[in-house]
């Protein structure tokens, strides 16, 4: 009984440590796509997903809408 309790506590601490290691320090990177033409929401999202497995959205820039892609940085 005592061995199984100690083992269970050890496994919980181990799993929590692994989860913390995975999420700690993960930064998000950004890149602008479709600079030469006006942004289309569906095209922007598709390009970002294909290129970086990220999320893309259009935002108003000075003269036109630009595509901003946000994705997890590679370490």
UniProtKB/Swiss-Prot annotation:
Where mainly found? secreted
Signal peptide annotation: 1-25
The biological processes this protein is annotated with in GO are: defense response to fungus; killing of cells of another organism
Q: Which residues cross the membrane?
A: none
The UniProt similarity line reads: Belongs to the DEFL family.
Keywords tagged on the record: Antimicrobial, Disulfide bond, Fungicide, Plant defense, Secreted, Signal
Q: Name one GO cellular component term.
A: extracellular region
Spell out the subcellular localization from the entry: Secreted
For this protein, the record's InterPro entries field holds:
DEFL
Q: Which PANTHER family match?
A: DEFENSIN-LIKE PROTEIN 122-RELATED (PTHR33830:SF10), DEFENSIN-LIKE PROTEIN 184-RELATED (PTHR33830)
**Superkingdom as given in the UniProt entry:** Eukaryota
The disulfide bridges present are 29-73, 39-58, 44-67, 48-69
Check the record and name the Pfam families matching this protein. SLR1-BP (PF07333)
Q: What is this protein called?
A: Putative defensin-like protein 119
| Coiled coil feature spans | none
């Amino acid at each position: 009984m005592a061995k199984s309790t100690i083992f269970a506590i050890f496994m919980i601490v181990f799993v929590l440590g692994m989860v913390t290691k995975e999420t700690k320090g993960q930064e998000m990177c950004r890149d602008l796509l479709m600079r030469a033409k006006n942004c289309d929401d569906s095209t922007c999202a598709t390009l970002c997903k294909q290129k970086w497995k990220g999320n893309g959205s259009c935002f108003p820039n000075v003269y036109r809408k630009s595509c901003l892609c946000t994705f997890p940085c590679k370490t």
